[in-house]
């Protein structure tokens, strides 16, 4: 197994489990998003609320500061959401972003939201609200699956991966232009805004309700392990030269068909993503003397991701049909 295959997943889990690691994960200080043709005048766009009331790993002033900066550059008004969804958390909100709620070591993973909250969000969207729900690898899929189920979305809840040509599992999945449908989120307002590629950095798989558009179709043959130790055990078996088919059958299952979905729900709109890092801009810095170069992931490493994020917001807010 090549050392980089699971680096991102290991770092992300380290933040949840909080062991002492030599390397540091941080927002990339060099990432400064610009938008050539903003959809809205500065500070005049719809209100985008990024949830912070549910032990969210991605926050406005933290891991999602780059995403918030991108949206502000496009004219959106972005703020943190600090209230439960059934107690004021949906007031004066045009777009609700819920990203990796439920960061916890508790086993089994408890729901991040109460039944009353999931019912409130579903009713809000049905009445015209716009939801961007993002939940990636364990434990975030399990924490969010109750909310996802309100919209008919099934979550794999584990670690989705594909096999490389070298026979290694990789959780970094790149979606090229030829994989995409012609949904407005992909095509944008014109040819200059077309999404040419998207890269996901360690997430889960998804299955949508009838009629949902698959924005990011999982690679043919993609699979999912239930948690990081299981995925690591699989990689170790493969590295040791074990029977690949037997190891895959024992330690993984076929992935669900998507890592990104879009659909209407009543008078509202929903986008669900199975990976959150794609819309951030992160830096993994290794200690001096380690002989390892800094690693970037997110919009700073995959330029198509920023266009994808903007087009998602444009579709949710009606800039795109």
Language-model region placement:
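Compositionally biased, low-complexity intrinsically disordered regions
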Residues: 10-11, 15
